Amino acid sequence: MSEFKGCPMGHGAAPQNGDGGDSGDTGNGWHGAQMDFARDMSYGDYLGLDQILSAQHPLSPDHNEMLFIVQHQTTELWMKLMLHELRAARDGVKSDQLQPAFKMLARVSRIMDQLVQAWNVLATMTPPEYSAMRPYLGASSGFQSYQYREIEFILGNKNAAMLRPHAHRPEHLELVETALHTPSMYDEAIRLMARRGFQIDPEVVERDWTQPTQYNASVEAAWLEVYRNPSAHWELYELGEKFVDLEDAFRQWRFRHVTTVERVIGFKRGTGGTEGVSYLRRMLDVVLFPELWKLRTDL
């Protein structure tokens, strides 16, 4: 019988001693684990942890500012992954490669679920605690997140006015401008349906990509045909449901944002100059994929 080696990643290795206890230090490593990384890449090296964990620089003396910084930095990391997945999924839809796109869209929805839960951590910050650090934030606001703006644009909520907060950083402005001028995920899905023979109005298939998604009757008619006969159009049916899953998760993320902000600052104006909760509530009315929601009434 061959000797048990355990998981190739080093987990679950066979005990080094006869009784299977915890005293597995043989002098060469703990249960066979490599202990010397003077010449090899370690966990921290691979993840760049020195850079990540030294990127928190509170400006106030308040204990709770670290929570505020870590909350928003981790959100930006998750949004980086969302953009990675959304761009690839959009490319998949554009090239008629829907199966890989389904996995990517499902992953984005789960990331949004993660971000919904993250608001529960920030909600542990009370109004007095936030008030103690708020003066140190200046005019900085999540409203200015260029990654969030890219996500909005990729999902079809275009607004050229939202370029202005990024004008002072040309490298960020270029990314947001590119997202503004590129067909959204939903635009590519509609063009895919047209390529597959559905009767879509030409002005929708080739439109001004800088404008937000608007309801169109021919698009709803196409989706209705898909939903009335899913077995004949299974890929498009699954794509439609992936979009609905994604928007549902996005709405929950937005809603939890509203309730957390109201809990912490009430109806004060946001640090970025917006109306705070009132502005965020209006954003809840944005519909990314209008035909996919309306058809549920019309089926």
From Swiss-Prot:
Substrate binds at residues 68-72, 130, 134, 271. Keywords: Dioxygenase, Heme, Iron, Metal-binding, Oxidoreductase, Tryptophan catabolism. Belongs to the tryptophan 2,3-dioxygenase family. Homotetramer. Residues 1-31 are annotated as: Disordered. It comes from the Bacteria. Its EC number is 1.13.11.11. Changing residue 134 to A: Abolishes catalytic activity. Binds 1 heme group per subunit. Its cofactor is heme. Pfam families: Trp_dioxygenase (PF03301). GO terms for molecular function: heme binding; identical protein binding; metal ion binding; tryptophan 2,3-dioxygenase activity. GO terms for cellular component: catalytic complex. It is an enzyme of class 1 (oxidoreductase). Residues 18-30 have a biased composition (Gly residues). One of its GO terms (biological process) is quinolinate biosynthetic process. SUPFAM superfamilies: Indolic compounds 2,3-dioxygenase-like. It catalyses: L-tryptophan + O2 = N-formyl-L-kynurenine. The lineage of its organism: Bacteria, Pseudomonadati, Pseudomonadota, Betaproteobacteria, Burkholderiales. The keyword Nuclease does not apply. Signal peptide: none annotated. Pathway: Amino-acid degradation; L-tryptophan degradation via kynurenine pathway; L-kynurenine from L-tryptophan: step 1/2. Heme binds at residue 257. This is Tryptophan 2,3-dioxygenase. Heme-dependent dioxygenase that catalyzes the oxidative cleavage of the L-tryptophan (L-Trp) pyrrole ring and converts L-tryptophan to N-formyl-L-kynurenine. Catalyzes the oxidative cleavage of the indole moiety.
